[in-house]
Amino acid sequence: EQYDADSLRYYLSINMPETHDTDFRWDEYVDRVNNELIGTYGNFVHRVMTLTHRLECDEGNPLSKYDGFSDHSKILREVDNQISNAIESMEKQRFKEALRSIMGIAQIGNSLLQEAAPWKFINEDESDERSTSLSSLSLSWRICSCLAVCMRPFTPFSSDRLWGMLGNQNDIDNVLWEDSMDVGTNL
């Protein structure tokens, strides 16, 4: 009752014995949950949601006008590569490996946000620099959608909550991992 089921599922998945025995250690559980699940995944999602909420918009998603403004083909290839690696790992029942690839997507998102620094442009007038930065935030929104879908086997309750916070009405279970960047993003 003291710990969220998803954090326990995450720890058990990332620490599960695939080739050798393993022990459950509370200190390692706390460390992995704080540094990986919260520090990488949770921090990225929180930043995207908070920054998007701070944008003024009359109706709909405030990021929709920035979607595709900048060329993010390199980032998209990196994310697609991580998704492909995760799918391949899941098919081979290498769940830890799959989870590492998915967490790699969150790391890509964090790097994208850090480089774009959209918090600097939230209250600025329209400019190419602002649009470029907010285009990265828009892509980060898509990455959150991808993470909700791909993390579903490991953190189902959190994934459902994130899917809903992103404004998605369709069933998350009907979205293929390889389509998760483009489906249900409400941009």
Annotate the PLM regions.
Residues 45-86, 106-133:
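Conserved, charged catalytic cores of large soluble enzymes
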Residues 2, 11, 32, 78, ...:
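Residues that form generic nucleotide/phosphate-binding pockets
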Residues 5-7, 72, 76, 83, ...:
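Alpha-helix initiation and N-capping motif
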Residues 33, 37-40, 44, 71, ...:
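Amphipathic alpha-helix face/heptad-repeat signature
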Residues 57, 95-96:
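Aromatic-residue-lined binding/catalytic grooves and analogous aromatic/hydrophobic interfacial grooves
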Residues 88, 92-94, 103-187:
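Basic, alpha-helical terminal appendages of large translation-related enzymes
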Residues 1-68, 169-186:
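Catalytic adenosine-cofactor/nucleotide-binding cores of aminoacyl-tRNA synthetases and other
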Residues 21-26, 80-88:
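Short, charged/polar, low-complexity loop and linker segments
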